[in-house]
UniProtKB/Swiss-Prot annotation:
Assigned EC number: 4.6.1.12
Gene this chain is encoded by: ispF
Protein name: 2-C-methyl-D-erythritol 2,4-cyclodiphosphate synthase
Spans traversing the lipid bilayer: none
Native organism: Roseobacter denitrificans (strain ATCC 33942 / OCh 114)
GO BP term (any one): isopentenyl diphosphate biosynthetic process, methylerythritol 4-phosphate pathway
Length: 159
């Protein structure tokens, strides 16, 4: 049985705005996230985890931030590409575990909608998508409220 695990990590700083987009869900907040695309740190991290499991590098290799066509792009484009690559190589994504690290906004009230959005985008059962959050106990840049970090793991199984 061919099982692959991939890990992803990403960070985005807070900047001007009135919401953040996480897992494709708009969450009201006094600031936005800064990035070349829509700065969906969670979706970027899951995308990188899938590319990692496939040994295909990272999101920046497939969608370079130096390429103006990706300016402001919706991150589901990137995630759908990674999911398609897995399928083309004969893999099914067994499950995804995504952990957001931030003091705010509070993720709990939005976690179910985030899971549902990711399941829809990835074409997976909701029971195979985990989205959760923790804080850094007010340490580091996330603890100071300067941005959001995210880690994710994706498990792929040869179909």
């Amino acid at each position: 049985m061919d099982i692959r695990l991939g890990n992803g990590f990403d960070v985005h700083a807070f900047g001007p705005g009135d919401h953040v987009t996480l897992c494709g869900v708009k969450i009201p907040h006094g600031q936005g996230l800064v990035g070349h695309s829509d700065a969906d740190v969670a979706m970027h991290t899951v995308t990188d985890a899938i590319y990692g499991a496939l040994a295909m590098g990272d999101i920046g290799q497939h969608f370079p931030p130096s390429d103006p066509q990706w300016k402001g792009a919706a991150s589901d484009i990137f995630l759908k590409h990674a999911v398609a690559q897995a399928s083309e190589q004969g893999f099914e994504i067994n499950n995804v575990d995504c952990t957001l690290i931030c003091e705010f906004p509070k993720i709990g009230p939005h976690a179910q909608a985030m899971r549902e959005a990711m399941a829809r985008i990835m074409g997976m059962a909701l029971s195979r998508i985990s989205v959760k959050a923790t804080t850094s106990e007010r340490l580091g840049f996330t603890g100071r409220g300067e941005g959001i970090a995210c880690i994710a793991t994706a498990a792929l199984v040869r179909a």
